[in-house]
Design a protein with these regions (language model features):
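Phosphate-group recognition and catalysis centered on beta-loop-alpha active-site segments
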Residues: 2-11, 18-369
C-alpha cells in the first residue's frame, strides 16, 4: 500500500473512533512519515487533543499514529523540580485534584503573569503527589466525547514524553519530533524553579541537543529564548499573540509588544536567536467583526524574508474555533470545514501548523498532493 493510501486509511480509522466505533483500534494503527525537511510540518497540539484529554501520553501517542511530525508538550515544573506536561501551572481544570480531599488545603490564589488565578498549582506538588492525580478533558462543553477518558491517564513527565517518542519512532519506522514549550518562564524563575536548566539537562541526557535532532523549543517570552540560544543547538521558535506583550518584557519595563516583535524590523531581531515564528493564526489572516477571514497580512512574507519558518496556532475542527467562513452550524461543538481553513492558510504560505486534529491535517495534505 502506498504511503498516502496508508495514511488515509489511518485517518478513516480515526474518524470511526470519533463516533465511538473503534477508539482502541485508532490508537494502534501506525502512520508513516509524510515528507522530508521541505514538507509541510504538522504539529500535534498538546497531542491529539481533539480526541483525548490534552497533555497525556495517550494524546501524544494518538497524534503520532495519525501522522504528526511533532508532538507538543507544554512544560511546567513540580515542587521538586521535575518538568511535567500541563498547559498551565494551575491544574484544577485539567486534573481531578479537586476530588482529592488530601489536597484541599493546597488550593490558593496567585498572580500568574499579572492575572489573578485561583486553584491548584504544579509547583506546590511533588512529582509523587502529582502522580496520584488523573487527567481530565479541559473543555468538556465542546469535547464531551473526550470525557469518557477522564480519570484514566496520569500527568506525564517530560522524560516520559521523550521515552514515548523514542519508542514510537522505532515502532513506526520514522522519526517523530518533539516541540516543547516553556510555559511562564518568568513566573517559575521568580520562585526559584527555572525551567530552562531542567530542559537543557534532559535534552542533553537524551542526546537531543544537536542540530540534527527533530526538536524545536518554543516560548511566548523573549529573554529565555535568547538565553537558550546560547546553550541549545536545536532551533528555537518565538511564539506571539494577536494582542499583548511577552510577560518577561512587561516585567522588565520593556515597552515592546507582540505587534512590535512581528513587524519586519522585529522579525529581523527574532532571527538573531530563533529559526521560527509561532503566531496566532489571526496574525496571518485576521477576522472581521463577524468572524469572517479578511486579507492576509504581510507576516508570512516578512518572516520568510527574515529567514524564519512560520507555524501558526491553533487549527481545530469545532465550529467555535473556526472562522465564520467554515462553520457548519451555530452549534459550537459540531465540526465545520477544517479542511478549507487549512487550505486557505497553506495558500497564504505558512510552513506548518499546530492542530488538535492531526488526522484532518494529514488527510488535507495528502489530498492536496
Amino acid at each position: 500500500m502506498s504511503s498516502k493510501l496508508l495514511r488515509l486509511a489511518v485517518t478513516a480509522t480515526a474518524a470511526l473512533a470519533l463516533v465511538g466505533a473503534a477508539p482502541a483500534m485508532a490508537d494502534r494503527n501506525p502512520a508513516p512519515a509524510h515528507g522530508g525537511q521541505d514538507s509541510f510540518t504538522i504539529v500535534g497540539h498538546r497531542g491529539a487533543s481533539g480526541y483525548r484529554p490534552e497533555h497525556t501520553l495517550a494524546s501524544y501517542e494518538l497524534a503520532a499514529r495519525m501522522g504528526a511530525d511533532y508532538v507538543e508538550p507544554d512544560l511546567v515544573t513540580t515542587k521538586d523540580g521535575v518538568l511535567v506536561a500541563r498547559h498551565e501551572p494551575e491544574i484544577g481544570g485539567t486534573t481531578d485534584v479537586a476530588a482529592h480531599p488530601e489536597f484541599a488545603g493546597r488550593k490558593t490564589t496567585k498572580s500568574l503573569d499579572g492575572v489573578t488565578v485561583t486553584g491548584w498549582f504544579t509547583e506546590d506538588f511533588t512529582l509523587a503527589e502529582l502522580k496520584t492525580l488523573r487527567a481530565k478533558e479541559r473543555i468538556p462543553e465542546v469535547r464531551q466525547r473526550n470525557t469518557i477518558y477522564d480519570g484514566r491517564y496520569e500527568v506525564p513527565t517530560f522524560q516520559e514524553v521523550i521515552n514515548l517518542v523514542k519508542r514510537l519512532s522505532r515502532e513506526l519506522h520514522r522519526e517523530i519530533g518533539i516541540y516543547p514549550e516553556t510555559k511562564h518562564p518568568t513566573y517559575f524563575r521568580k520562585q526559584g524553579l527555572a525551567l530552562e536548566p531542567q530542559l537543557v539537562r534532559l535534552l542533553n541526557r537524551n542526546g537531543l541537543n544537536r542540530s540534527s535532532a527533530k526538536v524545536y523549543v518554543q516560548s511566548f517570552e523573549v529573554t529565555n529564548l535568547i538565553e537558550l540560544h546560547r546553550v541549545l543547538r536545536v532551533p528555537l521558535v518565538q511564539l506571539t499573540g494577536a494582542t499583548g506583550a511577552p510577560f518577561d518584557l512587561v516585567d522588565a519595563g520593556d515597552p515592546r509588544t507582540y505587534a512590535d516583535i512581528t513587524s519586519a524590523r522585529g522579525l529581523r531581531d527574532v532571527s538573531k536567536y530563533a529559526k521560527g515564528l509561532g503566531p496566532d493564526k489571526n496574525q496571518v489572516i485576521p477576522r472581521d467583526a463577524a468572524g469572517f477571514l479578511t486579507t492576509p497580512t504581510t507576516l508570512v512574507r516578512d518572516a520568510h524574508r527574515a529567514g524564519l519558518v512560520v507555524h501558526p496556532y491553533t487549527f481545530r475542527a469545532e465550529n467555535t474555533f473556526l472562522p465564520a467562513d467554515f462553520r457548519s452550524s451555530a452549534v459550537a461543538s459540531e465540526y465545520g470545514d477544517l479542511f478549507a481553513e487549512i487550505e486557505v492558510f497553506r495558500a497564504a504560505g505558512v510552513d506548518g501548523l499546530f492542530t488538535d486534529n492531526t488526522d484532518i491535517a494529514v488527510a488535507q495534505e495528502d489530498l492536496a498532493a
